[in-house]
């Protein structure tokens, strides 16, 4: 019976979640690990490989209505096909002028890494145009770009567009060179609408911005000065008053790094709509020991600022701390404070999306990453709670306990609670003054179950980005997490509830998405097309959300993978699709039980085990290889000397060493001969991976066969055919039971020894032979005159 999405997700998030010491949180092992070359060989990934002299790709906008994805990079704006990013890409070359680049270099900036036009903002203006901004070599600029609707007539001036490998890009300039109108070139930039990007895009390309364009009004968290010291949340464009946060007020913003902006309505009343900003900043709570805190801030869209105080500044700005920590057994929490990325998972209720956030630890002693999940109910509860206030003899932070002005600070005008006030300019002065000095909430926002959903400690990488997809499987709906790392890989992870009210994390796969490892910068997902798009400094890759065939060719392998995208169809592991036939698709994500799901397909599991014969010499070592298909399986070695004997498990001893690749037998003895079986057990399903029949040969017999006396080896007379190998002549003289085994051993030995190449005439001799023959010195006398 199908389980609804809400019931399964609630069972995961509301079950008991016991605290685990942080030192015990080991990195999960992926079931499938693919290199970039192996990923390309599957045919499920494509890398944007057009020869552009650019770097720093950022996926800035996904337009599923037009099947396009818009990417910004250094000096370029790209429009890529969502189905195939290499199919006829549209490319605008938008570089800063040479004069501006020269001025940037003279100001002390790097000519390659800073003095370029790094595109940092692409927002949908309307159905036909985009609004784009770039750093402009430390001179931010913005303009409009035609989306590329073929039915629309083009203006007489336009950018030349690259539509293939052989196309050319226009020469860089602040104002592009006009070209002749072409109906084919429909993706173009409008140079006559070029304007300043101050308050919309940063000067420094290393500083990130978070933006949202709502009702033709641009909201952006950005640094607005050349030195990168004045950070603000701005509102520009549109008909409303231009707004910003209070300038140089560390209580509002203190050296922030903006991550994400999202419009989330509070109620059915549109006047209650709020824009949420996610960022990290240096905390002002403890100035003697400043730390980095993750924050969530919000503003009302209809905020007009104050009448006498906070003129043209936000009068509804509030912020709270986002906590992502692991509680310890002693009550001390290990915090992950550096917010890196945010993904907002929409639900059927647009007012209550689920917030996924990636955090990393501060400092260099302890390195770790975590993913925490937050609910809007908890976020709203904190913003409706007490304000942080400094009071007492030590001037410490306390919850504000005085008289609260009306309307409550942070309330939107004309909304559910203030229907009579049409503007924030109508608010009393005590409300505005309170907002200026009390922007911080006293309580913090904690994740669901007050602990992370995913934790990575002791790993050689850090998480950088997150994207989430909801997948309908045979036994319910699951949330699949795609996590980008700073070494250029993407992990596919699901977290399942267990019967004992704990949770279980499964890393289904880890793939390298770039030829050259580079940190994943941005990532977006298309559930409609079942594709994931990943960007870094070196390029853009799009890959399928599933590679079912990589799990194996058996029903048990497909079932044990527990991938919600995949199921056994009777022939292979393939994409799961809902069917009216109950047994047409074998899938068990919740339990992964192949014994129950793969009845009729498991009988051949042991029959298909690889069997081999291996030889060893007494006193030497032998390595028996065993590579189970799943790294999550438990491997055991069983030994059987004769068919009539019982199999016994090989324990780790002085002479037996178990490794990830197999079993090493040191100092072989004649009693070690027999049948070795490598078994893999996963989720109570056991099967034989490989069988090795080991023959142990005596040292004396092998030595005599390989190095016989000279009298035995007599060269045959000419014309009698190839000489008989000396070990065969010795074998005819010996009558020991293991002579046949020695013969097989030697045949295999000589078959694998590469033949010695014959010396060509004039070939160089070894130095020791060259030294034996000294060259003769010739004296050349001048001819007699």
Swiss-Prot record:
Annotated compartments: Secreted
Q: Which domain of life is it from?
A: Eukaryota
> According to its UniProt record, in which tissues is this protein expressed?
Expressed ubiquitously in adulthood. During embryogenesis, expressed in subregions of the central nervous system and various other tissues like skin, kidney, lung and intestine.
User: Which residues does the annotated region (Disordered) include?
Assistant: 583-602, 753-785
Disulphide bond pairs:
104-115, 133-142, 300-412, 324-372, 548-566, 678-746
Q: What is this protein called?
A: Semaphorin-3F
Q: Which GO terms describe its molecular function?
A: chemorepellent activity; semaphorin receptor binding
- Where in this chain does the record put each Ig-like C2-type domain? 605-695
Would you name any one GO CC term? extracellular space
Q: Does the keyword Lipid metabolism apply?
A: no
The residue range of the signal peptide is 1-18
Encoding gene, per UniProt annotation: Sema3f
UniProt lists the family membership as follows: Belongs to the semaphorin family.
Picking any one GO biological process from the record gives: neural crest cell migration involved in autonomic nervous system development
Taxonomic placement: Eukaryota, Metazoa, Chordata, Craniata, Vertebrata
What SUPFAM superfamilies does this protein's entry cite?
Immunoglobulin (SSF48726), Plexin repeat (SSF103575), Sema domain (SSF101912)
Where are the annotated glycans? Answer: 53, 126
Q: Which of UniProt's keywords are assigned here?
A: Disulfide bond, Glycoprotein, Immunoglobulin domain, Secreted, Signal
Ranges of compositional bias, category Basic residues:
775-785
Sema domain segment(s): 31-545
